[in-house]
Amino acid sequence: MKRQLEAYCAHLRNERQVSEHTSQGYRRDLEKVIAYCEEHGIADWQALQIQQLRQLIARLHHHGQSPRSLARLLSAVRGLYRYLNREGLCQHDPANGLSAPKGERRLPKVLDTDRALQLLDGGVDDDFIARRDQAILELFYSSGLRLSELTNLDLDHLDLAAGLVQVLGKGGKARVLPVGRKAREALQAWYRLRGIGNPRDRAVFITRQGNRISPRAVRLRVKVAGERELGQHLHPHMLRHSFASHVLESSQDLRAVQEMLGHADISTTQIYTHLDFQHLAAVYDSAHPRAKRSKGTDS
């Protein structure tokens, strides 16, 4: 079972071109299934049945795994069995028809427009780290990139004259996104200093040593910026969420936002309509005269 898991993970990286983060997540989930199989004397993937997989899901849920994590595990199992069936190594899928326990879908955390501008409009020193970090923040918010999409950018993926960036998203799907004026200006300022790092490759964002910046380093730099400018915890995906929410709020074009985010299913994008409704409800409650409660009344 472990040998076939290794082959599947190699397939994900080399043929599906998923990120290392996604590949490792699938590996961890499938290792839980293997551990369960070893515990119950299940020798191979063909022998695993739906009843046993259902029992594993119930056990993990009982021990505190979230519905979202369990849904991801089932997705990993389905992907593995699609691969095994295609390779002629298996003839069924025990995850077929199984679903994770339902859970409350949490709305993504976003910055409102004023807070986003506060983050981006802080003073920037004209040095290597400051210019690089500013360009990273501006590009995240301007184009709604995933963390892996940003760190994988090469110089020839950006056309600043045209205001476009080409990214490789999940499943190796390419898309072209607009880059706003402020982000272009920040990138141009960064390019002027980038050569100081004696770059060893064509990565857009590099360290002082000339190496491509890592996802971990970007998360840290975004966190530092959030604490410095906003006094709050900030992570890269919050900037992507903020981009999506603000574009949808202004345009009301859900399909366009779906394409820009690279979502395969529009239901994933629809979560931002709930954020927009939250904002509208807050405005209504604070502004509409019939929404304000009289003091001392409960009804």
UniProtKB/Swiss-Prot annotation:
Entry keywords, A to Z: Cell cycle, Cell division, Chromosome partition, Cytoplasm, DNA integration, DNA recombination, DNA-binding
One annotated GO molecular function: DNA binding
Active site, UniProt feature: R146, K170, H237, R240, H263, Y272 (o-(3'-phospho-dna)-tyrosine intermediate)
GO biological process: cell division; chromosome segregation; DNA transposition
Keyword Ribonucleoprotein recorded: no
A GO cellular-component term linked to this record: cytoplasm
Family matches, as SUPFAM superfamilies: DNA breaking-rejoining enzymes, lambda integrase-like, N-terminal domain
Domain Tyr recombinase: 106-285
Compartment(s) where it occurs, according to its Swiss-Prot or TrEMBL record: Cytoplasm
Pfam families (alphabetical): Phage_int_SAM_1, Phage_integrase
Domain Core-binding (CB): 1-85
InterPro entries: CB (IPR044068), DNA_brk_join_enz (IPR011010), Integrase-like_cat_sf (IPR013762), Integrase_catalytic (IPR002104), Integrase_recombinase_N (IPR010998), Integrase_SAM-like_N (IPR004107), Recomb_XerC (IPR011931), Tyrosine_recombinase_XerC/XerD (IPR023009)
Record's keyword annotation contains Cell cycle: yes
PANTHER family: PHAGE INTEGRASE-RELATED, TYROSINE RECOMBINASE XERC
Family (UniProt): Belongs to the 'phage' integrase family. XerC subfamily.
Known partners and oligomeric status: Forms a cyclic heterotetrameric complex composed of two molecules of XerC and two molecules of XerD.
Role played: Site-specific tyrosine recombinase, which acts by catalyzing the cutting and rejoining of the recombining DNA molecules. The XerC-XerD complex is essential to convert dimers of the bacterial chromosome into monomers to permit their segregation at cell division. It also contributes to the segregational stability of plasmids.
Protein name per Swiss-Prot or TrEMBL: Tyrosine recombinase XerC
Organism of derivation: Pseudomonas putida (strain ATCC 47054 / DSM 6125 / CFBP 8728 / NCIMB 11950 / KT2440)
Lineage: Bacteria, Pseudomonadati, Pseudomonadota, Gammaproteobacteria, Pseudomonadales
